[in-house]
């Protein structure tokens, strides 16, 4: 069976699962102090690229790729191009991509959120872009602190994010199922997607 056919068959189940999921009224776990108690990505919130608060519970029932991005990195073109391609081919199957700009690595994302949004538009980005954040240190966004300590979110040689375009694969229940290093291109994730749709 082709992946496209599988996606069409599973789409109604994904939508029903998202609507029937328990705990939709739960409180967000977005503070700097209580992130350790979270059980899924869906308990967090983040500001989108336009500064609006987004409850990540909206991704319940979807498979997500969460990545830190930068516009002036040597890996920018290949990552943006492949992420746009993955999103175009699998969004209908239930894939969502969450891109978090970050300036912590070589100061390669120096622009404002508006400038980053304009840059991403040059790649015809249709996936969700968030406001610029830190992914390491005390000021790291709580979601990123949480993802790094999950059993399948830990890194090689420590849990810190090593560079731009570290990617986390998150299942429909909001659990981290795999971490991909910055040198792994997004197309590598494609082989893992069918298990989680």
Swiss-Prot record:
Key words, A-Z: Cytoplasm, Developmental protein, Lipid metabolism, Mitochondrion, Oxidoreductase, Peroxidase, Phosphoprotein, Selenocysteine, Transit peptide
EC number: 1.11.1.12, 1.11.1.9
Expressing tissues: Expressed in testis. Also expressed in liver, lung, kidney and spinal cord.
A cellular component term, taken from the record's GO annotations: protein-containing complex
Gene3D superfamilies: Glutaredoxin
Residue numbers carrying Phosphoserine: 40
Catalytic reaction equation(s): a hydroperoxy polyunsaturated fatty acid + 2 glutathione = a hydroxy polyunsaturated fatty acid + glutathione disulfide + H2O; 2 glutathione + H2O2 = glutathione disulfide + 2 H2O; tert-butyl hydroperoxide + 2 glutathione = tert-butanol + glutathione disulfide + H2O; cumene hydroperoxide + 2 glutathione = 2-phenylpropan-2-ol + glutathione disulfide + H2O
Gene Ontology MF annotations: glutathione peroxidase activity; identical protein binding; phospholipid-hydroperoxide glutathione peroxidase activity
Pfam families: GSHPx
Keyword Nuclease: no
Role description: Essential antioxidant peroxidase that directly reduces phospholipid hydroperoxide even if they are incorporated in membranes and lipoproteins. Can also reduce fatty acid hydroperoxide, cholesterol hydroperoxide and thymine hydroperoxide. Plays a key role in protecting cells from oxidative damage by preventing membrane lipid peroxidation. Required to prevent cells from ferroptosis, a non-apoptotic cell death resulting from an iron-dependent accumulation of lipid reactive oxygen species.
Annotated family: Belongs to the glutathione peroxidase family.
SUBUNIT field: Monomer. Has a tendency to form higher mass oligomers. Interacts with FUNDC1; this interaction promotes GPX4 recruitment into mitochondria through TOM/TIM complex where it is degraded by mitophagy.
Descriptive protein name: Phospholipid hydroperoxide glutathione peroxidase
Natural source organism: Callithrix jacchus
